[in-house]
């Protein structure tokens, strides 16, 4: 639903959290009980580091066969034939009938389900077992469901000293008994299937001996890993050894991820099942064209290289729904019907969708190029969409806020209407979609509430969720995001108007359908523009996690996946020590050299460390397995030349003693990035370029996130000894660089000027060499980078990257300058930490700051910038600033009583509700407001007002508030390094003395004032009802009449231009403008022009000839 700038999608609400994760989660075992069609479970907090499997039993989500047969009987045959046009291409005969051909497909989603052991593939097994399901697409576009058997969940513990085969057997019996007690409701014949003695080594700390004995504990079902881990960690009595508690290893890895690691499968790669190694499914369980069973050991996983780096033709469905809300209420599934669903289906890599349709409740006029399907009842609309999903069989479902709004709304609405068969939207036959509330918590992304909608076999890609994770924007409404990335806006129809359009005629419903289609089209445009599919598939390939993990989980799972893969190669195991960071609890962060604030009119060279933190970890061999704890250092008696002592006091062995795993991972990532960038230069094919660019970006992000993984104290494997060592080396290098630059580049050393380091950030230093041309600064920058790089251990390298000229340094992490990489012309104006786009800033601040920086940096005109500020402040005080520039917008995330303190936008929403509940903002809407004049001492929340109400009633705004609370701080930050008395110069003086205040027309005391006519010439009060001019202005009729006519004509032209602009945005020049996008400046200009034009016409009517 997309009303009022995605108002219908609760704009500004927290983003969606985990979508269908690769390891399905519903019930922790026990006797399966069928849930209701859209069971909404409680909201667990799914922290990014918290990884637990929950077993879904195959029978619990399945409708009975005869029940499904009855439901299919009443399907509309005409509709079925209409939908069948969009089916996938038919399977070739040899695949459809036999198993004589290899099956290769690109996998998109991996999950598991609990079912009976396969009698043919596993003749010696019985009882429930985990069956992995891999969903994917072949090169020809055929959908595949591959059911993988025989892979068992397991974990490790350290084997106690002196434990022999007999002891292990007794331990097995004891553990089996404890597991039986803990899982009384389970019908599994054996909980602990076997315990094997293996030789492994822990990843933690340097250990000279090659390996030591571990016990590999194999259990029956994935959830039993957590149950067994709990028993062992709490303590268990072992005959001959007494009571003992164990540290477990690799016991917190999701089952699907464990399978992928052991089978060398990465997210989004190509998998092949050889001919003769698979069986056609005896009982068809999915809607996929090809369903087969095989053993996990028979799968062939291809590396993403050559032909296997290409993309399959995925089917991507982008959809949007519209709901008819009651007056004054945001749509709720318990009351408000779904009235339209727009769908676009595109093949991955193609520019245009091959399916464009809209399903409407009641008749709808035709739309060019769109299949319009009209239905008499809401039930028919919902079932038609369910059938459409089944026939089109999309691999990826996208939209804007679909995980939190559209999909849950459809499921809950079907439940209200008792349409039992609707929630069968996944790829498993008759399996209902499950919805549950979730809360995702991560240090990087914060706490977010969402809904987990499990659509089996289909990846849900919510563009809102992706935007909030990957970009920092002032607003995340679809309108605002589209304007930012696509350079186009869309018509915003407030949810209060949608019901009126629906209840009109087929033409008004067509208007709504066009609007709905645009809201389905824009997410697809954004997906293509931002190369999301390429980038996310490449990130999944690089990090080895399923694609769905990238949206539903945080950063640490990606590093853990790479660490587990490398550890498996080295025969190492990873302990489960979550949240138990060793060593000190905190460490000193990166160095930021003191900023010498000022306006620099000579070129400033920037020297950057290439991948600083990864380089430090590689150079000094910093890893879990190379760390020597203080107590071990004394015992091992390592010679000083064999270890690195870090500036923070830690000890790590050098690579010639033992190479670290983290440095190896980083070397491979950065070498792969170098190859990808080299291939990118050579590549000509646009699809190949997109894949390679996505890959090099994924490799860069992955390398940079390794350091953060070691420093996450609540992460999977925290090690503050590593992270504190990295930052201490970083600090040392920044200070070393500063010293070398200032010691070498001096007049005594033969240079023209003494170099000066004016600022140093985490991984870069800014140097003023004193030369006056960009070209000379570039030469010295390159010389300095080469000279200093030679003093560091490889691969640490200082690079010259750019020149800032001129450069405005405000303070730490706040600066602006012209960015040069070519001495002929600057690339762009670069700013950091300067609030040009903040949610609590009005547009006037952004425009003012941007224009000032342009005048100072590009035009080199500081007096011009000062004069521009003075003129703007004067215009503000004289009420000459367009109201749209003064609008502040904030999201209403909860009701007024739920806020701890009174907020301007919340109080305004309450006042607007009292005026007109039908059009007032509701929870999820963004509330625009301006600050108006009020009694002295009134709080800001008492002075907030609706901009439209202000326009209609001529209410004066409070320019002093904007000057003091919005404009002054950003301006002073820019001008204080340039002007001596910036505050006195800019904010005081003659330009601030003249203030204009408009008279309210219908509020306060003006409600009781008697209005009198004034002369149209000199504004003097005149008596009589029909007079136009006073006695003194008689004789000037022609001049004043022409002036009035000219004023009306000008305002009509202005209004016409703005109206046409809005019509072009809505896509029709023949219909009224309904848009109420309060994020859009044109909206307020149009309203003001309309009001001014009406007032001017009233003046014109007073001329009576």
UniProtKB/Swiss-Prot annotation:
A zinc finger (CysA-type) spans 1015-1033. It is an enzyme of class 2 (transferase). The keyword Plastid does not apply. The keyword Zinc applies. GO terms for cellular component: delta DNA polymerase complex. Keywords: 4Fe-4S, DNA replication, DNA-binding, DNA-directed DNA polymerase, Exonuclease, Hydrolase, Iron, Iron-sulfur, Metal-binding, Nuclease, Nucleotidyltransferase, Nucleus, Transferase, Zinc, Zinc-finger. SUPFAM superfamilies: DNA/RNA polymerases, Ribonuclease H-like. InterPro entries: DNA-dir_DNA_pol_B, DNA-dir_DNA_pol_B_CS, DNA-dir_DNA_pol_B_exonuc, DNA-dir_DNA_pol_B_multi_dom, DNA/RNA_pol_sf, DNA_pol_B_thumb, DNA_pol_palm_dom_sf, DNA_pol_type-B. Zn(2+) binds at residues 1015, 1018, 1030, 1033. It is found in: Nucleus. [4Fe-4S] cluster binds at residues 1062, 1065, 1075, 1080. It catalyses: DNA(n) + a 2'-deoxyribonucleoside 5'-triphosphate = DNA(n+1) + diphosphate. Its main location: nucleus. GO terms for molecular function: 3'-5'-DNA exonuclease activity; 4 iron, 4 sulfur cluster binding; DNA binding; DNA-directed DNA polymerase activity; nucleotide binding; zinc ion binding. Its EC number is 2.7.7.7. Pfam families: DNA_pol_B, DNA_pol_B_exo1, POL3_N, zf-C4pol. GO terms for biological process: base-excision repair, gap-filling; DNA replication proofreading; DNA-templated DNA replication; nucleotide-excision repair, DNA gap filling. In eukaryotes there are five DNA polymerases: alpha, beta, gamma, delta, and epsilon which are responsible for different reactions of DNA synthesis. Heterodimer with subunits of 125 kDa and 50 kDa. The 125 kDa subunit contains the polymerase active site and most likely the active site for the 3'-5' exonuclease activity. This polymerase possesses two enzymatic activities: DNA synthesis (polymerase) and an exonucleolytic activity that degrades single-stranded DNA in the 3'- to 5'-direction. This is DNA polymerase delta catalytic subunit. It comes from Oryza sativa subsp. japonica (Rice).
């Amino acid at each position: 639903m997309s009303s009022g700038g995605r108002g219908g999608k609760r704009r500004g609400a927290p983003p969606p959290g985990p979508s269908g994760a690769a390891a399905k989660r519903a019930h922790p075992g026990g006797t399966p009980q069928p849930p209701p069609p859209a069971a909404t479970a409680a909201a667990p907090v799914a922290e990014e580091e918290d990884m637990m499997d929950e077993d879904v039993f195959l029978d619990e989500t399945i409708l009975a066969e005869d029940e499904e047969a009855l439901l299919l009987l009443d399907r509309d045959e005409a509709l079925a034939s209409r939908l069948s046009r969009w089916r996938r291409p038919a399977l070739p005969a040899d695949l459809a009938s036999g198993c004589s051909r290899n099956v290769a497909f690109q996998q998109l989603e991996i999950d598991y389900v609990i079912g009976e052991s396969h009698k043919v593939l596993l003749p010696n097994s019985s009882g429930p077992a985990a069956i992995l399901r891999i969903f994917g697409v072949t090169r020809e576009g055929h959908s595949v469901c591959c059911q993988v058997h025989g892979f068992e969940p397991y974990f490790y513990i350290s084997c106690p000293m002196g434990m022999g085969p007999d002891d292990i057997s007794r331990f097995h019996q004891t553990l089996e008994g404890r597991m039986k007690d803990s899982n009384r409701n389970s019908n599994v014949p054996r909980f602990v299937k076997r315990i094997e003695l293996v030789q492994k080594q822990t990843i933690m700390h340097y250990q000279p001996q090659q390996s030591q004995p571990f016990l590999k504990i194999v259990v029956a079902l994935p959830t039993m890993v957590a149950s067994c881990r709990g028993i062992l960690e709490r303590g268990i009595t072992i005959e001959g050894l007494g009571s003992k508690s164990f540290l477990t290893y690799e016991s917190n890895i999701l089952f699907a991820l464990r399978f992928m690691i052991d089978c060398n499968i990465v997210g989004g790669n190509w998998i092949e099942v050889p001919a003769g190694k698979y069986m056609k499914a005896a009982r068809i369980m999915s809607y996929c064209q090809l369903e087969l069973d095989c053993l996990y050991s028979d799968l062939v996983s291809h590396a993403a290289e050559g032909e296997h780096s290409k993309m399959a033709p995925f089917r991507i469905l982008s959809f949007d729904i519209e709901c008819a809300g009651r007056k004054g209420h945001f749509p709720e599934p318990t009351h408000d019907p779904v009235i339209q669903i727009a769908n676009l289906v595109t093949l991955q890599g193609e520019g245009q969708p091959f399916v464009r349709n809209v399903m409407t409740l009641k008749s709808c006029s035709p739309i060019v190029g769109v299949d319009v399907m009209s239905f008499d009842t809401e039930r028919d609309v919902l079932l038609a969409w369910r059938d459409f999903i089944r026939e089109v069989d999309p691999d990826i479902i996208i939209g804007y806020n679909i995980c939190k709004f559209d999909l849950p709304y459809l499921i809950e609405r079907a439940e209200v209407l008792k349409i039992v068969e609707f929630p069968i939207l996944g790829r498993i036959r008759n399996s209902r979609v499950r919805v549950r509330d979730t809360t995702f918590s991560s240090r990087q992304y914060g706490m977010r509430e969402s809904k987990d909608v499990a659509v089996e076999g289909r990846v849900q890609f919510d563009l809102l969720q992706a935007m909030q994770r990957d970009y920092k924007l002032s607003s995340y409404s679809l309108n605002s995001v589209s304007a930012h990335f696509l350079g186009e806006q869309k018509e915003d129809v407030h949810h209060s108007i949608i019901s009126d359009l629906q209840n009109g005629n087929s033409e008004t419903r067509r208007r709504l359908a066009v609007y709905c289609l645009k809201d389905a089209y824009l997410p697809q445009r954004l997906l293509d523009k931002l190369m999301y599919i390429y980038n996310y598939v490449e990130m999944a390939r690089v990090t080895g996690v399923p694609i769905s993990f990238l949206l539903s989980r945080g950063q640490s799972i990606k590093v853990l996946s790479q660490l587990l893969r490398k550890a498996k190669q080295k025969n190492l195991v990873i302990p489960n020590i979550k949240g138990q960071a060793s060593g000190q609890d905190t460490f000193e962060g990166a160095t930021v050299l003191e900023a010498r604030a000022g306006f620099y009119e000579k070129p400033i060279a920037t020297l950057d460390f290439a991948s600083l933190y990864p380089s430090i970890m590689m150079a000094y061999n910093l890893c879990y397995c190379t760390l020597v704890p203080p107590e071990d250092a004394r015992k091992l008696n390592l010679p000083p030349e064999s270890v690195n002592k870090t500036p923070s006091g830690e000890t790590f062995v050098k690579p010639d003693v033992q190479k670290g795993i983290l440095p190896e991972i980083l070397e491979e990532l950065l070498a792969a990035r170098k190859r990808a960038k080299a291939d990118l230069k050579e590549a000509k094919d646009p699809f190949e370029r997109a894949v390679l660019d996505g890959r090099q970006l994924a490799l860069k992000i992955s390398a940079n996130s390794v350091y953060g993984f070691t420093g996450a104290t609540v992460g999977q494997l925290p090690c503050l000894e590593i992270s504190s060592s990295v930052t201490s080396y970083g600090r040392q290098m920044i200070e070393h660089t500063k010293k070398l630059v200032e010691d070498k580049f001096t007049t005594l050393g033969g240079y023209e000027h003494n170099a000066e380091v004016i600022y140093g950030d985490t991984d870069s230093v800014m140097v003023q060499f004193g030369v006056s041309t960009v070209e000379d600064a570039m030469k010295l920058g390159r010389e300095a980078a080469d000279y200093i790089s030679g003093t560091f251990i490889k691969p640490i390298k200082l690079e010259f990257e750019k020149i800032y000229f001129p450069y405005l340094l405000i303070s730490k992490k706040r600066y602006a300058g012209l960015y040069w990489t070519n001495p002929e012309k600057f690339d762009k104006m670069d700013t950091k930490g300067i609030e040009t786009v903040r949610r609590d800033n009005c547009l006037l601040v952004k425009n003012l700051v941007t224009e000032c920086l342009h005048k100072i940096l590009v035009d080199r005109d500081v007096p011009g910038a000062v004069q521009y500020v003075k003129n703007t402040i004067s215009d503000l005080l004289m009420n000459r600033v367009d109201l749209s520039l003064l609008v502040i917008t904030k999201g209403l995330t909860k009701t007024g009583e739920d806020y701890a303190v009174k907020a301007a936008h919340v109080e305004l929403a309450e006042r607007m509700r009292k005026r007109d509940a039908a059009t007032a903002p509701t929870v999820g809407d963004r509330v625009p407001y301006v600050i108006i004049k009020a009694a002295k001492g009134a709080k800001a929340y008492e002075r907030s007002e609706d901009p439209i109400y202000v326009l209609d009633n001529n209410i004066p705004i409070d320019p002093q508030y904007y000057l003091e609370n919005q404009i002054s701080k950003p301006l002073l930050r820019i001008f204080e390094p340039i002007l001596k008395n910036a505050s006195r110069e800019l904010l005081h003086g003659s330009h601030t003395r003249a203030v204009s205040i408009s008279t309210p027309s219908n509020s306060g005391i003006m409600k009781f004032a008697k209005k009198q006519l004034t002369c149209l010439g000199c504004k003097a009060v005149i008596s009589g009802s029909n007079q136009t001019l006073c006695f003194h202005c008689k004789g000037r009729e022609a001049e004043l009449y022409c002036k009035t006519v000219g004023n009306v004509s000008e305002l009509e032209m202005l209004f016409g231009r703005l109206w046409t602009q809005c019509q072009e945005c809505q896509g029709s020049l023949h219909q009224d403008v309904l848009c109420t996008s309060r994020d859009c400046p044109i909206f307020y200009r149009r309203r003001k022009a309309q009001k001014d034009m009406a007032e001017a016409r009233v003046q014109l009517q007073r001329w009576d000839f």
